[in-house]
């Protein structure tokens, strides 16, 4: 219900819809047998720190994202031997670290690794810190916000029409700021 409400009430502008379409087309081109499902991963760095006792005031280790992504893929798609991950992050270094730790059979795409210059141009060039963002010029803030919206659309599968053959996320691995002693990583099956 919430997904359909969000997707029908909050709509991207035509320009944003074109960027989302371009990113989805590239994602589909990375799928082995045409449109398929993929696992999305969101790694937040910058001023977002962990709140659990284990990772209080530090970033959740990238290795936990890798372990959660691989385990989720194996659990939900045991017959697949070539997983496709979409990785969104405010930190190019976090994406590199994530890629370095993955098994070689995993295919990965992200805005920063796009073959399209316009998509690479909206990828976050550095970890997000709100105070720094507030000091940026308007055009840079607009570009970074566009990247966040495209990442959001691919992470969550928003704005895909029911009959659209696009690749869809079947699960998302992300770090959350829990105030309880729950594990820092969530595995949310969309």
Which residue stretches match the model-derived regions?
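A donor-sugar binding/catalytic signature common to diverse glycosyltransferases
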Residues: 146-190
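Mature hydrolase/peptidase catalytic cores and their serpin-fold inhibitory cores, especially
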Residues: 95, 132-153, 157-158
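Core catalytic architecture of nucleotide-activated donor-dependent transferases building glycoconjugates
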Residues: 1-132, 139
């Amino acid at each position: 219900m919430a997904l359909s409400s969000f997707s029908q009430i909050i709509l991207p502008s035509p320009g944003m819809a074109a960027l989302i379409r371009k990113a989805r087309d590239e994602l589909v081109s990375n799928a082995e047998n045409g449109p398929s499902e993929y696992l999305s991963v969101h790694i937040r760095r910058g001023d977002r720190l962990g709140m659990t006792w284990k990772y209080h005031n530090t970033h959740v280790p990238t290795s936990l994202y890798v372990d959660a992504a691989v385990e989720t893929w194996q659990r939900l798609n045991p017959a697949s031997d070539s997983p496709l991950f979409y990785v969104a992050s405010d930190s190019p270094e976090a994406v590199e670290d994530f890629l370095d730790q993955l098994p070689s059979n995993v295919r990965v795409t992200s805005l920063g690794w796009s073959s399209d210059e316009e998509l690479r141009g909206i990828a976050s060039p550095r970890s997000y810190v709100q105070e720094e963002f507030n000091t940026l010029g308007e055009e840079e803030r607009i570009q970074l916000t566009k990247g966040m919206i495209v990442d959001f659309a691919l992470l969550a599968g928003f704005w895909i029409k029911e009959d659209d053959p696009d690749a869809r996320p079947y699960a998302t691995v992300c770090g959350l700021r829990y105030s309880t002693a729950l594990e820092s990583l969530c595995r949310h099956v969309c």
